Design a protein with these regions (language model features):
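C-terminal low-complexity, glycine/proline- and small-hydrophobic-enriched intrinsically disordered tails
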Residues: 1-182
Length: 182
């Protein structure tokens, strides 16, 4: 009820677990095969906007020393024009914050930014496309666009700061080790 009265409400996130996908390289299921949706992975942030945002909004993730790890925006990044060697329906859409009125959910995969890469083939020569090997558990729309992803953050306490209309809303959250690892 309190969120209904505030122009912006940034909900306290639950702890996020560092869980990695396996590395099995095999043929994925065809995209037309019905499969269940996986839960969002990483840190999940919920925010409420009583009115549409009048400008861009940002979500900044900071480490315990207040250094910025990642920043996300409501402005889409420029598209990567390098063609992939797989159908584009496998690739994940860019992560963009929503600015419409209402409740929104955003997931951060607990990773640092992707490193810059050069497009090399398996044989070591430069190529003019992005080369992917899809895992057997690949799902349409959930394959990273970058062929090399950034490393995961270590377990610890982090701060997420949502900036909307010139105001900032900060929430601390914890990243915990995979509970299956001891």
């Amino acid at each position: 009820a309190k969120a209904d009265l505030a122009p912006v409400h940034f909900f306290a996130p639950s702890p996020a677990s560092r869980i990695r996908w396996d590395n099995t390289q095999d043929t994925p299921l065809p995209p037309e095969m019905k499969v269940g949706d996986n839960p969002l992975e990483g840190a999940v942030f919920d925010y409420y906007l009583a009115q549409p945002a009048t400008g861009p909004i940002t979500l900044t993730i900071s480490d315990p020393s207040n250094a910025t790890i990642r920043e996300f925006s409501s402005i889409a990044p420029p598209p990567d024009t390098t063609m992939p060697n797989v159908p584009e329906y496998w690739l994940m859409a860019p992560t963009v914050l929503k600015t419409t009125a209402g409740h929104h959910r955003f997931a951060w995969d607990l990773r640092y930014p992707d490193p810059p890469t050069l497009n090399f083939s398996y044989y070591g020569n430069m190529i003019d496309y992005r080369e992917y090997t899809l895992n057997w558990h690949a799902l349409p729309g959930q394959t990273y666009i970058s062929t090399v992803v950034g490393p995961m953050v270590p377990a610890g306490t982090y701060t997420a700061t949502l900036a909307v209309g010139g105001r900032k809303y900060a929430r601390q959250f914890s990243v915990v080790q995979d509970p299956r690892v001891n």
